[in-house]
Amino acid sequence: MQRGFEELADTLGKLVDRPDEVALVVAVGLASAVQRRQRGVAYHSDRGTGTVAARTMRRADGRIEVIIESGFLTEVDAYGQGRFTPAGQPQLSRRGLAQMRKTIIHEAQHATMHQRNSGYDQFEVGGHAGDYPRWDYAVAAKILDEYRAEWNAAQHDSRRPPSVNDVLDVLGHLGSELAAADARYQAEPDPAAVATVMEGVYNACAAYWTWMAYWVAQFRGNQILVGAEIQNLNLWKRYVGSTWEGLIQILDEVPIEDLGAPEAKLRQAVARVAHHWVPQSLHQTGFRHVVTTGGEAFYIDDHDFPSERS
């Protein structure tokens, strides 16, 4: 296992500007490690169709920690139990190490953006929250952050465009989560339940939007956007539709080759995603979230949330 950790640390160090300011942290549990560093903020590593393997965080002193989940590196048997070496040490999963290396390459881009003062923290999410429906600016900043990191990661390592199964996994899970949120609200449709259903919808969409950012990054600069086999999927038509082209139009204009891109251009792009694309995507999935003179209003416009793989 030690050799695997050293390989990952070496990969990380080669991809950031100032390796001495970046530490690789191997955590027994990613969620608890993040929460210890971010007191009072809920964090769950279960995300969409899987589990988050890593998180990059800037410390108060300016140093950066890339935290990874150690369980991804352990070989397991058919029953999900960890395998051990004759010496009683956890057995390293070579497949897990290869996948974690891809994750490290992605997280290194986040670390570099932090070092060049152009990462998520620089978007001043809190200062812009009042200009948009709750969470829209924050999720827009997240979309842009993940898009830039994934595109640059692809320059260091091969990234394949999404397959039909990849898309069905993500959109099927999205449909299930939206249906569950709607069902909880319909079972008890009182004013207090509005905040709950809104949170459930945003949580479901956040994982989906992250995948959209990855996919757009993988297709950047290509004339062929997605194949007909994906565009013709019922779930794609239902949840994505024209929002795919809309997100591409915005993100294609974002300067990404330099991870220290001008702050003004990045904030302009975030504002466009928050103002135009997030509401468009919510509407496509069946919801509206608007700011009125009396406050915020959240509407459910569709109660059909398919999840069947078709």
Identify the role of each PLM range.
Residues 28-30, 70-72, 109, 117:
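Short, flexible loop/turn elements at secondary-structure junctions
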Residues 1-26:
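Zn2+-dependent metallopeptidase catalytic core
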Residues 170-310:
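Pan-zinc metallopeptidase signature
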Residues 42-101, 114, 308-310:
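Active-site scaffold of zinc-dependent metalloenzymes
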